[in-house]
Amino acid sequence: MIDTTPTESNLSGLDKKAFQKNINNQQTDLYILKNAQGMEVAVTNYGCALLSIMVPDKNGKYANVVLGHDSIEHVINSPEPFLSTTIGRYGNRIANGKFTLYGEEHQLTINNGPNSLHGGPTGFHTRIWNAVQPNESTVIFNYTSADGEEGFPGNLEVEMTYRLEDETNALVIEYRATTDKAT
């Protein structure tokens, strides 16, 4: 259970230092998004995990409406590795970890019995994404999945944006991807 005692910097009570870790010369971090209506979202660049969504109830009391994590260690070592993270390159199972594309068979990394699940054991959910926070309500994550990663063909450039809207008080999540090969 996440302690939702507000801190000076965020409503969720999450400690920024608990999300800062150097892993293979890459730095993980915590990003707090806020909008004009007081809504707040916390995310990390490790797997683009959504950690908290703090919204006010009808009495103005804030509550977290997401089952998230309270530290980077909890994200990394969770018994549910896909909980609150971004999965990929593929969502769901690929039977026997194989698929044929334009007559060429591709063998994927197996991580769910005989199958490949949610992009494999080191899919997007385990990657440290580059992050840019252009303003208080937006963070943009980027990741390059190399040709052959987890068995998938093609270099894949992925951009994921979390944005809080002021007027609708909505969290918008946008995905964009381009590849240099059929995948």
Predicted segments with their positions:
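Surface-exposed acidic/polar loop and edge beta-strand patches at domain peripheries
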Residues: I2-T183
